[in-house]
């Protein structure tokens, strides 16, 4: 999730993980893309959400957020918000058009903490620097920068150039139907431009049409099948089977406007580098023009590229939090559960399950009851590998891992241990005969048989994006990183690879225990080094040597695990 809690303030932007925001009182939303709304749902009832007027409408349409929690702020105006309960400290915020997707804005914050500019996702244009709030050589203390395309080796064309490339592809295929793969929001101006150029209706589904009506775009869209030459589908619909079916009815080409480094493997699929994020050169121009004192990347690390562009005149100053703001940040936030509306306990529940942990690092679980007020001043924008546990915890207690006798479903709860809290990632994996977890990888992405993503690692990708144990708390990303484990025939028995001292086992478990009870004990006590889990070696090693089954499935005669237990206990 691309969001931040601004340190030394009660402010969060695009961050909806409430356990990380216990001291936050002002929530801001830059735009409506799903990676910036993760954790936000119709049950939100905690604090007002500040956003642009258009994003406010989309919040109501797409997430059904109650109107009383939405606070639209006009773009280009100064807005004053209270930072305490006494009216002593105030915040001035100005919204700037981010040139990214409909309703997307940047936030310029000014207060006791100095001046901070949060870009959210944006595509830089020189006109941004001419808005009144950025004129007169304003000093930016901290710039939170969207560095999605922060790769000096990749050149991206402007959106106008990419649009011309798409138009030329369509001209080169007269009589062909055109299918364009997009996400649910964004690139609407491209569709309007193509409709005007080729004088045709653009066919969309009903859900997208509802969004387009909210955006009040020109009337060039329809839901009537076959009414126009151009049709918009979700990117995941661009598949070999669909292309074959479409071409049986009419000659069809597919176009994917994306900044992701992809190469088409199909003669009728065209990948065009159309991006709503700033190119590296544009980022360099933007940072150079603002010359901020310090820079915080939103997506990953980019300081090696921009350190020379930071202001040489000043050094970051220490922020002194006013006492009234401290009290405001410590006030009970009355955070409620997003599922059943019940008030959550402030104390951390005891975690149960199999802990995958490095032998060198002992798992420590902080308790909210022992935390003092200084916890609210933790810098959430810095990544400290020593502060975050490098393990994933699989909670296989009786309440979270069970077999449904009627459906045969399994539900697995993945929990990530962090320095401040335990973030529960609910991965309700429903298994049936027709779908495995591995088939869920492609949801929302084009068919890999048609295109492949270039083996090109961007400098913006942080270490947290590369390993499951230090990955994003987004449930989809974490679960996909575990696919190599789920795809094997056994999940729970992975814990049996690294065995403890046999003497400690026999002393802790009486010989009279049945093998299944012993197996449960193994799963609750064995550890696997995080580096082995990261490389996916654990399960592959097990499957090469044993025919292992999950504990709640029938065991074959002569199960090697039972034999291993007997050997272990005989030592």
UniProtKB/Swiss-Prot annotation:
Main location as per UniProt: nucleus
Pfam families in the cross-refs: DRMBL (PF07522)
Residues covered by region (Disordered): 346-386, 431-487
Matches recorded under CDD domains: SNM1A-1C-like_MBL-fold
First-level EC class: hydrolase
Subcellular location: Chromosome, Telomere; Nucleus
One BP annotation, GO: double-strand break repair via nonhomologous end joining
Family annotation (Gene3D superfamilies): 3.40.50.12650, Ribonuclease Z/Hydroxyacylglutathione hydrolase-like (3.60.15.10)
Protein EC: 3.1.-.-, 3.5.2.6
Gene Ontology CC annotation, any one: centrosome
Catalytic activity annotation: a beta-lactam + H2O = a substituted beta-amino acid
Composition bias, Basic and acidic residues: 367-386, 453-468
Renumbered ranges of motif TBM: 501-532
Known role: 5'-3' exonuclease that plays a central role in telomere maintenance and protection during S-phase. Participates in the protection of telomeres against non-homologous end-joining (NHEJ)-mediated repair, thereby ensuring that telomeres do not fuse.
Assigned protein family: Belongs to the DNA repair metallo-beta-lactamase (DRMBL) family.
Record's comment describing the protein's domains: The TBM domain mediates interaction with terf2.
Record note on quaternary structure: Interacts with terf2; the interaction is direct.
Stated name of the protein: 5' exonuclease Apollo
């Amino acid at each position: 999730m691309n969001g931040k809690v601004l340190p030394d303030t009660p402010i969060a932007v695009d961050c909806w993980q409430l356990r990380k925001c216990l001291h936050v009182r002002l929530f801001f939303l830059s735009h409506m893309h799903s990676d910036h709304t993760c954790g936000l749902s119709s049950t939100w009832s905690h604090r007002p959400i500040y956003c642009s007027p258009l994003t406010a409408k989309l919040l109501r349409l797409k997430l059904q957020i109650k109107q009383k929690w939405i606070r639209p702020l006009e773009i280009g105006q100064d807005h004053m918000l209270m930072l305490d309960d006494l009216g002593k400290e105030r915040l001035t915020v100005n919204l700037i058009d981010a040139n990214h997707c409909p309703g997307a804005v940047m936030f310029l914050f000014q207060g006791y903490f100095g001046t901070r500019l949060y870009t959210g996702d944006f595509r830089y244009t020189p006109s941004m620097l001419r808005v009144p709030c950025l004129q007169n050589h304003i000093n930016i203390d901290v710039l939170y920068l969207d560095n999605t395309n922060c790769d000096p080796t990749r050149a991206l064309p402007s959106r106008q150039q990419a649009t011309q490339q798409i138009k030329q592809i369509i001209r080169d295929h007269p009589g062909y139907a055109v299918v364009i793969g997009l996400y649910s929001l964004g690139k609407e101006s491209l569709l309007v431009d193509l409709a005007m150029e080729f004088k045709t209706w653009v066919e969309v589904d009903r859900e997208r049409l509802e969004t387009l009506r909210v955006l009040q775009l020109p009337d060039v869209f329809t839901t009537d099948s076959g009414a126009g030459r151009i049709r918009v589908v979700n990117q995941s619909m661009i598949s070999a089977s669909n292309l074959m079916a479409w071409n049986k009815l009419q000659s069809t080409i597919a176009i994917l406007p994306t900044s992701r480094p992809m190469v088409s493997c199909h003669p009728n699929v065209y990948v065009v580098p159309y991006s709503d994020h700033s190119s590296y050169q544009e980022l360099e121009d933007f940072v150079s023009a603002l010359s901020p004192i310090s820079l915080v990347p939103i997506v990953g690390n980019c300081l090696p590229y921009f350190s020379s562009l930071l202001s040489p005149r000043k050094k970051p100053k220490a922020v002194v939090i006013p006492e009234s703001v401290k009290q405001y940040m410590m006030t009970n936030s009355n955070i409620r559960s997003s599922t059943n509306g019940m008030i959550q306990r402030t104390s951390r529940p005891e975690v149960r399950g199999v802990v995958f942990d490095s032998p060198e690092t002992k798992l420590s679980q902080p308790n909210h009851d022992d935390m003092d007020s200084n916890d609210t001043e933790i810098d959430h924008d810095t990544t400290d590998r020593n502060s975050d546990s490098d393990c994933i915890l699989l909670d296989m207690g009786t309440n979270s891992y069970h077999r449904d006798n009627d459906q045969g479903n399994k539900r697995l709860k993945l929990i990530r241990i962090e320095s401040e809290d335990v973030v529960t990632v609910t991965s309700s994996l429903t298994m049936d005969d027709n779908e495995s977890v591995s088939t869920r990888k492609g949801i929302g992405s084009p068919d890999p048989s048609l295109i492949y993503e270039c083996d090109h690692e961007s400098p913006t990708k942080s270490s947290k994006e590369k390993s499951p144990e230090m990955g994003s708390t987004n449930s989809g990303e974490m679960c996909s990183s575990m696919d190599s484990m789920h795809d094997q025939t056994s999940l729970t028995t992975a814990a049996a690879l690294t065995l403890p001292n046999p003497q400690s086992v026999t002393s802790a478990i009486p010989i009279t225990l049945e093998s299944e009870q012993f197996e449960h004990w193994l799963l609750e006590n064995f550890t696997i080094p995080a580096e082995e889990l990261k490389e996916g070696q654990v399960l592959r090693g097990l499957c090469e040597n044993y025919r292992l089954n999950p504990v709640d499935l029938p065991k074959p005669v002569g199960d090697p695990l039972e034999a291993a237990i007997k050997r272990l206990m005989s030592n």
